[in-house]
């Protein structure tokens, strides 16, 4: 690996670990650019969206984008090496501040080192301590000066532990329009206007697509056998995943499938129903007011470990935020092609449920719409001023 260039006079260190963190960080960067001097540089680990905001990533973000206990073990040496190099670079010339974006298992270690060096630390995105690993809050107290929360119930949890926290809303609620433009999205993607459309989102990680992709393709084939006029749209998160998806598509040549590069928001906006992997995309689907079926698969050993952790009864963000099941979840052994096809077609035909979800998700959207970029950036600026960094 080439060594990063010499550090600029004023910089803010940041580290994001996957596509959702890249999006969150890019929006926060917009807010920071509007408030901080132009000579402040932003560098560390990030993705393409952060790069569009002038961020310099010295390590490839995709190296950190690994899900599951077993999968992490396979990449652990490389991940630890990247973290060690990042800390060395930051400690050699401490930045004005460090912002860890999600990726808590990676970032908390870096954040603790930064705080010990006197660097103000903000962590963006509360870990799901309300779902599992509540004991992690002690680590968070050591790691951060302030935590930015995406959901309204989270700051109270941190207040009880004496950790400064601010509800910033969810940036996706600012980005996604309250009223989806279905016809406009279909036109942009070249999809037929007069047919039912199912968007299929297998995830943004290679390991997710590898495990879940074949099942989703088999489910699409079953749905098309029942509803021959269905159209499917599948956004590929990156070029590497596009190759894997194209290979799976070749095994189902008769599918009425449009594979698009990126454009996941347009795909969701264009859809009547969404079949998707658990993750941030489930919240995006809710913000587009769509019926959905949530699914997920991890390797067997990872699943056994997860079962012992005491999770909430649901994994999808629409259900977590609702405090109950409002959309179906089919996970692990329940995620068969037959079950996924059956449940997706049921969602497609249940017009009363679709109307309920439109209203329910509209209220959720209004709650989460808080102008995150401005609120989050102001927290960072206030912390910097309070510590004499500006």
Swiss-Prot record:
Q: Name one GO biological process term.
A: lipid A biosynthetic process
The reaction(s) catalysed by this protein are:
a lipid X + a UDP-2-N,3-O-bis[(3R)-3-hydroxyacyl]-alpha-D-glucosamine = a lipid A disaccharide + UDP + H(+)
Known SUPFAM superfamilies for this protein?
UDP-Glycosyltransferase/glycogen phosphorylase
Q: Which GO terms describe its molecular function?
A: lipid-A-disaccharide synthase activity; phospholipid binding
The Gene Ontology CC terms held by the record are: membrane
Q: In which pathway does it act?
A: Bacterial outer membrane biogenesis; LPS lipid A biosynthesis
| InterPro entries named among the record's database cross-references | Glyco_trans_19 (IPR003835)
Taxonomy, superkingdom: Bacteria
Keyword annotations: Glycosyltransferase, Lipid A biosynthesis, Lipid biosynthesis, Lipid metabolism, Transferase
Query: HAMAP family in the record, alphabetically?
Result: LpxB
Hey, which family's this protein in? Answer: Belongs to the LpxB family.
What is this protein's function per UniProt? Condensation of UDP-2,3-diacylglucosamine and 2,3-diacylglucosamine-1-phosphate to form lipid A disaccharide, a precursor of lipid A, a phosphorylated glycolipid that anchors the lipopolysaccharide to the outer membrane of the cell.
Listed name of the protein: Lipid-A-disaccharide synthase
